[in-house]
Regions:
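Active-site-adjacent beta->alpha loops and helix N-cap segments on the catalytic face
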Residues: 33-51, 92-106, 121, 139-144
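Catalytic alpha/beta core domains of metabolic enzymes, predominantly
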Residues: 109-144
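Active-site beta-loop-alpha junctions enriched in small/polar residues
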Residues: 7-11, 30-32, 64-68, 93-96, ...
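Short beta-strand/loop segments at the ligand-binding rim of alpha/beta enzyme cores
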Residues: 1-4, 55-64, 103-115
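Glycine-rich, proline-tolerant flexible connector loops at the mouths of alpha/beta enzymes
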Residues: 24-45, 62-70
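N-terminal basic/disordered segments at the start of proteins
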Residues: 1-26
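Conserved, mostly hydrophobic/aromatic
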Residues: 17, 94, 127
Length: 144
């Protein structure tokens, strides 16, 4: 399934992107997600998810950072928060995210996005068996 996936700079920017035909939005906090266009702290994230859902669109949260042991308590708290907010999908790269998400009663769907290149089906199959439902492939791949 192809969808127009965008990374907004702010809640106000989401409104413009909805008007332009965006299907899904990648948002999140800079300390948990990589390559985000804007910072969506918890209050802004709640507002953004509500706006996105009210327009029948999808809210994905980037939790694709690299997490060390000292990040794990904050990571768990953030994933619990994302579950409460009812985000549509988490974009991840670190196995700790999978473990915490799968502790939830109704796990949030996962989208594997390792910041390394995803170039073969072995990688996709491996993470699929671990709970990922989608993968973001390397830009270097052709559609063939």
């Amino acid at each position: 399934m192809t969808e127009l996936l965008v990374t907004p700079k702010s809640v106000k920017h989401i409104e413009t992107l909805i008007e332009k035909g965006a299907d899904a939005f990648v948002i999140g906090e800079q300390r948990f997600g990589l390559r985000l266009a804007g910072e969506f702290k918890r209050e802004a994230l709640i507002e953004a998810v509500e706006l996105i859902h009210n327009h029948g669109k999808k809210a994905y949260v980037a939790v694709n950072g690299i997490f060390h042991n000292y990040h794990l308590n904050a990571l768990k708290s953030y994933i619990d928060f994302l579950h409460e907010v009812s985000v549509d999908r988490i974009i991840f790269g670190d196995p700790a995210v999978v473990m915490y998400v799968n502790e939830q009663p109704n796990p949030i769907p996962l989208n594997w996005d390792a910041e390394a290149l995803v170039t073969n089906y072995f990688q996709c199959n491996y993470w699929g068996k671990k709970g990922a439902q989608r993968a973001q492939l390397a830009r270097e791949l052709s559609l063939d």
